[in-house]
Amino acid sequence: MSLDWIVRIVQENGPMFLRGAWVTLYISIIGTLVGTLIGLVIGVIKTIPVPEKGVKRIILKIVNGILSAYIEFFRGTPMIVQAMVIYYGSAAAFSIDINKTFAGLLIVSINTGAYMAEIVRGGIISVDKGQFEAAQAIGMNHFQTMRNIVLPQVVRNILPATGNEFVINIKDTSVLNVIAVSELFFQTKSVAGNNFRYFESFFVACILYFIMTFTITRILRFIEKKIDGPENYIIAGNQMQVARAEDIVRKAKEV
């Protein structure tokens, strides 16, 4: 590896690397957000109680079957294959010329949605059943219970998994180069094809990928800590209040 070549590649092709990194982040952010929304909707639908008989039971069974097929298909096939099928398949079957970036957003979104659906469903199931029973006792239906009681807890609980999906998407967008999306990997291939210094070019790409994933991971951990709040609490006057240092010391002395 030549350090001089790395410096030269960065100086001559810096804008291409930055443009590719921006497209990677753009697709990852939008794809993760849309995928999370898809996952929330599917998670809520799949946890609707199925009655023992009636038309509602038949409808829910059909809908759950379709959603399960969607989840299994996109979780069970590689994203690179999905990209080829959706982009080239839509053009061949329906004569639709999809914009490459839009196709990338669509692929990442529906792929993430399949994974997030199971994460959300698991988060909903993990909520204490007593909360569902209490909501039902005061006359709430399933969607009111989800909106007012369950989902606020679920969103907090699935935040780490959502962050992991975001980091995975940053790396997995590299497969979109097969449909010529100008993300970081695609731009790096172009740079390496021009100077024939593949190792040095992709070393620069590695550094950029690491900077993005490392930074995003630290930001997400900071957000999680902020949401968790302080570690020490005391109960006073039926109110949950943050304990001050002197309060903790005083209580320790009393004990």
PLM region descriptions:
Residues M1-V255:
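Transmembrane alpha-helices and adjacent helix-loop boundaries
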